[in-house]
Amino acid sequence: MKNNIIKKIEDIIGKKNVLLSSEDKNKYLTEWRNRYPGKARAVLRPKSTKEVSLLLKLFHQKNIPVTPQGGNTGLVGGQITYSSKDFIISLERMNKLINFNKVDETIIVQAGMLLTQIHNICDENDMLFPLSLASEGSCTIGGNLATNAGGVGVLYYGNTRDLTLGLEVVLSDGSIINLLKTLKKDNTGYSLKDLFVGSEGTLGIITAASLKIFQKPKDKLTFLASASSPKKALDFLRMLQKNTSIPLTSFEIMNNHSVDIVLRNFGETKLPISKKSNWYILFEFSSYEKNKNTTESISEIVNLGIEKKFI
């Protein structure tokens, strides 16, 4: 006879969305390096905020542990359970666009939408959602919110928290808090959304978010340089920031180990620098107008960094 709790869960989300076999659960219980092999009684795949609410209400009543999961791209094991009594709630089916407003420069999506899907929606409408990171093809916006992801554009656009206008959250007892505001100039009451962003599911499960989007730049200049040390890289960053009014929208320092992993796993990728280094810098300027003088101006500043031996 089927366990009573499993039967109740199936009544909420449907039998096919309750994964019980080891084969079905496996991809949710391991990350790509196989460093955090987990255990779970079942993986649950709700499709709506209401279903998440009913699940958490049930687990709250039964005092059953649960872990929310986005794209399972985290590298510290926070998205995986380690007890065969616990449950994982995967939000992968909650991947719908709720609203897109080009005039207000906002987008509202369910938490299971892939980051790259948000990029595509914005790109099709000549807009930009600036959060960008290596796992964007498989990570979800819910995971980005739960971890307050930074990405390569963090110095200019800020962390995920800075890009968030509002949230919809389900608390541990099943209560739904709708904070899906799109008003940018909002000084009413406590900023509860800021508590949930970065809380990694400990305060509740984020089910939807309203986000800031931006006009898409007309031109981009992307550079890869080598540096002898992180200090030299930071000296170069300060020099760039002081000597140009053109937005420096990305600046990422990478060690040679990280670059070697990319080169080993992506065979067509080539390092466009002849001499290997211990440190590399990936940086990008964005402009809202195409201008030959812009390219020349930035090139002069980069060459100045070479002369000063920052890069």
Question: Model-predicted segments: where are they?
Answer:
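Noncatalytic alpha-helical scaffold of FAD-dependent oxidoreductases
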Residues: M1-I311
